Amino acid sequence: MENKKTIYFLCTGNSCRSQMAEAWGKQYLGDKWNVYSAGIEAHGVNPNAIKAMNEVNIDITNQTSDIIDANILNRADLVVTLCSHADSVCPSTPPHVNRVHWGFDDPAGKEWSEFQRVRDEIGERIKCFSETGE
């Protein structure tokens, strides 16, 4: 089924939030959506994001930290910004691309429990989207 839609998760560094969103997206949306993530910059995948996702049996060790790809951005059906910085500085999207903002706290540099909380919040949000389309 190659009539999949494309969802593109964006945050500042493509290190934590968007990496987790990509993983949850593949889990909950993978049969209907091509799921990608990127950042305004590429900071590398945060080891605590890898560890947090491992706790829920999702392996993101092979995910890469990438800057926004104009080709994916321009052909995406849905672009989701995950932080206010990405929302404000994200390159403009064409009129046919639906763009929404789902804000989540940045766990980088914070306590371990923050990674777990943000991971769970992102997972719940994407699960809800998979069930309701919103």
Swiss-Prot record:
Known InterPro entries for this protein? Arsenate_reductase_ArsC, Ptyr_pPase, Ptyr_pPase_sf
Q: What is its main location?
A: cytoplasm
- Tell me the keywords, alphabetical order: Arsenical resistance, Cytoplasm, Disulfide bond, Oxidoreductase, Redox-active center
Matches recorded under SUPFAM superfamilies? Phosphotyrosine protein phosphatases I
Q: What class of enzyme is it?
A: oxidoreductase
- Give the disulfide map: 11-83, 83-90
Any Pfam family hit:
LMWPc
Which Enzyme Commission numbers does its entry carry? 1.20.4.4
Q: Write down any Gene Ontology CC term.
A: cytoplasm
Where does this one sit in the cell?
A: Cytoplasm
User: Which residues does UniProt mark as catalytic?
Assistant: 11, 83, 90
Quickly give the catalysed reaction.
Answer: arsenate + [thioredoxin]-dithiol + H(+) = arsenite + [thioredoxin]-disulfide + H2O
Query: Which GO biological process categories is it annotated with?
Result: response to arsenic-containing substance
Any one GO MF term held by the record is: protein tyrosine phosphatase activity
In terms of CDD domains, this protein maps to:
LMWP_ArsC (cd16345)
The protein's role, per its UniProt record: Catalyzes the reduction of arsenate [As(V)] to arsenite [As(III)].
UniProt record similarity statement: Belongs to the low molecular weight phosphotyrosine protein phosphatase family. Thioredoxin-coupled ArsC subfamily.
Q: What is this protein called?
A: Arsenate reductase
The gene name reads arsC
